[in-house]
Swiss-Prot record:
Gene: Mill1
Region Alpha-2, annotated ranges: 151-242
Region feature (Connecting peptide): 343-373
Signal peptide: 1-30
GO cellular component: cell surface; external side of plasma membrane; extracellular space; plasma membrane
Subunit structure: Heterodimer with B2M.
Keyword Lipoprotein: yes
UniProt-recorded name of the protein: MHC class I-like protein MILL1
UniProt record similarity statement: Belongs to the MHC class I family.
Glycan-linked positions: N98, N102, N165, N323
GO biological process terms on file: defense response to bacterium; defense response to virus; DNA damage response; gamma-delta T cell activation; immune response; immune response to tumor cell; natural killer cell mediated cytotoxicity; negative regulation of natural killer cell activation
Membrane topology listed for this record: Lipid-anchor; GPI-anchor
Database matches in Pfam families: MHC_I
Length: 404
């Protein structure tokens, strides 16, 4: 059944009124959400607040790992050296040894600068001993009767880990042709087979493994000393990856609010544990988020990054500044919007914040009152007039909530 013209018009007006009411309701919720998430902060001396050092147990005690990966080939190939050694600190490569050139080199420039010639000679000598040990074992294995004279590969993974409580744990694994072979047990000081074996295989391999007393000395003394030496070199000289960077990004939401995100990159370990990233509004601390374990993210190059976000109202962005305070420096980045089309920096209109919301709420109420009053005069609808008074009441409540 078709509605009359008057009923259709009244239904359209009611739908339009409900749309305006819903729009105001969502806007008021957004403001309330903003006020809950970004509370006002007292007038605090920013230097005293941001420069308090925070030291984590991870910075002092670890865990940290020093690991060697060794590979020896039974045949000399023109494309590859017969023996290769890589050394890893916390699973990142930083030192390698090439038997063809008989030299040790580092992928980290600061290791080259910090270590003296005597240190390099000692490191090279230690690696050469590992090379000779690996080559002897491979020669004994391939020299046995019945062994295939083709290409064989002997691999070893060994090292130590510094625990959080200051204790160390060692490990030594051997592999042959890509399969796990033997593992050293530090408690019993014996080698155990890692794969299904017969007594003949056990008798063949275990006597040819490195001597237990030499392995124990390396895992208990040599490796922990090397790990501590490397940790000392890391603490004495900062990473050479450039200065920290601070980037501010924006994200607009349809409910009348903007998310400001501040990201800090290129943070050295001592910066990440003793620095603070915070938002300032008109030079006053708004929301502070200190660097804590669990919030620091590794970047993959031994530096770290962190971010902090707040919600603001459209037009308030120029009032906010992101502040990165760390030992040795201070970086500030203003929240200036970049026009993605022209690349020019712009600012939001000055009408914003609570005043803007109140203005919009009052405008909606007045417009609604005018339209519905005009319609009720033509139709004489008492029900529509009653709806008007309810809408005026709710709009007034929303305006008051916006001011709170």
């Amino acid at each position: 059944m078709m509605l009359s013209r008057d009923l259709r018009a009244e239904a359209a007006v009611r739908l339009w009124i409900m749309f305006l009411l819903l729009e105001d309701l969502l806007g008021a919720c957004a403001v309330g959400d903003y006020q809950r998430r970004v509370p006002s902060a007292p007038n605090t001396d920013i230097r005293n607040t941001l420069e308090k050092p925070r030291v984590t147990t991870q910075e002092v005690a670890g865990p940290h790992t020093l690991r060697y990966d060794l590979m020896a080939l039974s045949l000399k190939l023109p494309e590859l050296p017969q023996v290769l050694i890589w050394r890893y600190f916390d699973d990142e490569p930083f030192l390698h040894y090439n038997e063809s050139s008989n030299r040790t080199d580092s992928w980290e420039p600061r290791i080259k600068r910090h270590w003296r010639a005597m240190t390099w000679a000692r490191e090279t000598e230690d690696l050469q001993e590992m090379v000779e040990q690996l080559k002897r074992m491979l020669a004994e294995v391939t020299g046995q009767k019945g062994q295939d004279k083709g290409l064989h590969i002997l691999q070893a993974t060994l090292g130590c880990e510094l625990q959080r409580n200051g204790s160390t744990r060692g490990f030594w694994h051997l592999g042959y042709d890509g399969r796990n072979l033997l593992t050293f047990d530090q408690k019993t000081l014996t080698w155990t087979m890692d794969m299904p074996f017969t007594q003949q295989k056990k008798t063949f391999w275990e006597p040819r493994a490195p001597r237990a007393d030499l392995v124990k000395t390396f895992l208990d003394d040599t490796c922990p000393a090397q790990l501590q030496r490397h940790l000392a070199s890391l603490r004495s000289e900062p990473l050479d990856t450039g200065s920290p960077m601070v980037i501010v990004t924006f994200r607009n939401y349809p409910l009348g609010r903007v998310t400001l995100t501040c990201r800090a990159f290129n943070l050295y370990p001592h910066m990440a544990t003793r620095g603070t990233l915070a938002w300032l509004q008109d030079r006053k601390l708004v929301k502070q988020k200190a660097f804590e374990p669990g919030t620091i993210l590794p970047s993959g190059d031994r530096t770290y990054q962190i971010w902090v976000s707040i919600w603001v109202l459209p037009g308030q962005e120029p009032q906010f500044t992101c502040n990165l305070s760390y030992h040795g420096g201070n970086i500030e980045k203003r929240a200036v919007i970049v026009n993605t089309v022209s690349g020019e920096k712009t600012r939001q209109p000055s009408t914003s914040g609570v005043g803007g919301r109140v203005k919009k709420s009052l405008w909606t109420t007045m417009t609604t009152a005018f339209m519905v009053t005009s319609w009720t005069r033509k139709t004489g609808g008492d029900s529509t007039l009653l709806l008007l008074w309810w809408l005026l009441f709710f709009s007034t409540v929303l305006a008051v909530l916006t001011l709170v």
